[in-house]
Amino acid sequence: MTTDDGFGAEGTIPDADLPAIPVSAGALVFDHAGRLLILKPTYKSGWTIPGGVMEADGETPWEACRREVAEETGLDIGAGHQARLACMDFRRPRPGKPGGIRFLFDWGAFGDATLGGIVVQPEEISEYRLADLRTALSLLRKPIRRRVRAATRGRRLRYLEDGLPVPGVGERPARR
């Protein structure tokens, strides 16, 4: 039984009413020359950025991002490093694809000492490279390309739907 406010009798939300939406998180990792770290996965075509799906055990998007980047590249962001949320993208479901929510974090730029320590997970990643943004965008798969392009344009937080900015969201609110 649900009450008028949508909660169950005990103040909980009935599980049947909750959407099952996959959440993933990716990372923009640059070198000091402004080149973006991109990866070639073994399990799908094209290039991507480091990141992956959030675990269902209560992991947060930021924790998923750190875990996936460490698993795929060996890079681990320490507690003292500052990253920023670059965008959040709502992907609509499509036939055979569940859709989901994608977080993209900008980890900033790293030096050769850090990036020289990249060790890819060969079961998942066949190759990596640092590419200037134009080249990286041309290699990335379309949904990721849109997200990265939007996130790097103006370096402001972006809300996207299917990889595209939503008119009226993210702009300055009108003064009233």
Predicted regions and their residues:
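Acidic, metal-coordinating catalytic segment for phosphate/diphosphate chemistry
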Residues: 1-26
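A generic structural micro-feature
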Residues: 19-21, 95-101, 120-125
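Conserved Nudix-box catalytic region and its N-terminal flanking loop in Nudix hydrolases
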Residues: 31-71
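Nudix hydrolase/Nudix homology domain
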Residues: 45-47, 121-176
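A short coil-to-beta-strand element that immediately follows conserved catalytic motifs
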Residues: 76-87
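Active-site-adjacent beta-strand/loop module that shapes the phosphate/pyrophosphate-binding cleft
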Residues: 89-117, 150-152
